Amino acid sequence: MMRFLNHCSQGRSAWLLMILTALILESSALYFQHVMKLQPCVMCIYERVALFGVLSAGILGVIAPKTPLRWLAIILWIYSAWGGLQLAWQHTMMQLHPSPFNTCDFFVNFPSWLALNQWLPSVFEATGDCSVRQWQFLTLEMPQWLVGIFAAYLVVAALVLISQFFSRK
């Protein structure tokens, strides 16, 4: 299995699949926001940024999968998936255990050199409350789904990282 993952990581198909999954998830988020009129909260925006990190890792990987750039893509993938998992878990806890002491910020807080909410407010501006449950599918709220999604990204990324130390046949 590890040799297979190593082989896949050195081809473009697996990276394109990762790009496709991230694009579908980002498109779903924009559909929820602009068509279904669900208001994204600060945590939703941060989770969206983590998903863009996974998307960026896929783009890096597809550019040159047989070069050391692949290692940078894998590291970005792990970093983004881990960050997204932490954010989704924290968001889930806010929704499952609401408390006046456990709230999210009123506004997104990006660094001045990366003011995404000012550059593209239709995608990165938060207008909702993190503790409000707006959407449910199969008894799970959106942050709970994201916990599973980011956990899956993280597990696959860790396996791909480990597979890099197995030689290709």
Swiss-Prot record:
Subcellular location: Cell inner membrane
Keyword set includes Nucleotide-binding: no
Source superkingdom: Bacteria
Segments in the Periplasmic topological domain: 32-49, 90-144
InterPro entries: DiS_bond_form_DsbB/BdbC (IPR003752), Disulphide_bond_form_DsbB (IPR022920), DsbB (IPR050183), DsbB-like_sf (IPR023380)
GO CC list: plasma membrane
Gene Ontology molecular-function annotations: electron transfer activity; protein-disulfide reductase activity
Transmembrane portions of the chain: 15-31, 50-65, 72-89, 145-163
Record-annotated disulphide pairs: C41-C44, C104-C130
Residue ranges, Cytoplasmic side: 1-14, 66-71, 164-169
Key word Oxidoreductase present: yes
Membrane topology recorded in Swiss-Prot or TrEMBL: Multi-pass membrane protein
Keyword list, A-Z: Cell inner membrane, Cell membrane, Chaperone, Disulfide bond, Electron transport, Membrane, Oxidoreductase, Redox-active center, Transmembrane, Transmembrane helix, Transport
Alphabetical GO biological process terms: protein folding
HAMAP family in alphabetical order: DsbB
Function of the protein: Required for disulfide bond formation in some periplasmic proteins. Acts by oxidizing the DsbA protein.
Protein family (similarity comment): Belongs to the DsbB family.
Name recorded for this polypeptide: Disulfide bond formation protein B
